[in-house]
Swiss-Prot record:
Coiled coil: none annotated. Catalyzes the deamination of various vicinal amino-alcohols to oxo compounds. Allows this organism to utilize ethanolamine as the sole source of nitrogen and carbon in the presence of external vitamin B12. GO terms for cellular component: ethanolamine ammonia-lyase complex; ethanolamine degradation polyhedral organelle. The lineage of its organism: Bacteria, Bacillati, Bacillota, Bacilli, Bacillales. PANTHER family: ETHANOLAMINE AMMONIA-LYASE LIGHT CHAIN, ETHANOLAMINE AMMONIA-LYASE SMALL SUBUNIT. This is Ethanolamine ammonia-lyase small subunit. Pathway: Amine and polyamine degradation; ethanolamine degradation. Its EC number is 4.3.1.7.
Amino acid sequence: MNEQELKQMIEGILTEMSGGKTTETVEATPAKAITETVVTEGSIPDITEVDIKKQLLVPEPADREGYLKMKQMTPARLGLWRAGPRYKTETILRFRADHAVAQDSVFSYVSEDLVKEMNFTPVNTKCQDKDEYLTRPDLGREFDDEMVEVIRANTTKNAKLQIVVGDGLSSAAIEANIKDILPSIKQGLKMYNLDFDNIIFVKHCRVPSMDQIGEITGADVVCLLVGERPGLVTAESMSAYIAYKPTIGMPEARRTVISNIHSGGTPPVEAGAYIAELIHNMLEKKCSGIDLK
């Protein structure tokens, strides 16, 4: 077989192959119409505004009224529900939102405008910032020489009572309660012919800072109003620590404490009246803490 015959044979084979091949017709699929996204202006509901005491997420509870009655007695997160082993999305978001509020309260400061409005005398402990305040509680109990002089110059020596306000671990607690509780304390003290004048405001305040203030001023009673460590229930809880003639290094048992002062606990006006009564009793009995019967 010569070259020419080989070419003819190959062409024949190719012709047979192409001739026997069937072609399929593919119908073009029309393109789908593009749907335009419509954006509307609106607002997302604030889940932190929901009253947990009135919210019941359990579907078809056996005793709905009894469940809600129990929830009215506590701010605990009762009556939640789940998707499989997990909490519902709404529950998780509310938890994170409340946790964020607590964090913000710890790391924020009391407004300087409020300090000026209330005519407080501002001083600072040895802490330079929030990080040092949180990691070095010992520095939040002490004042340097400059601050000692500021305290001495702006207080009455050997007064019967010295009121101190401290930011503590919750600036929100001070901003939410201080305007209500101070007039209540003042009004209550009038019943016992007692009063107070200049109020010290302590930035980066730890509770034992009141002990050094007691030694500087020589006051018979020192009352510290300070922000409590915030939790998931509220970031606005304040405490009152009161001591008769406090001294540096004294045992904690010498302090009398009124805690949970906020709108959902002991109202500030009510707490103020009770604080005034305690101060009077301390001055009468010359003691505080567990010694105060």
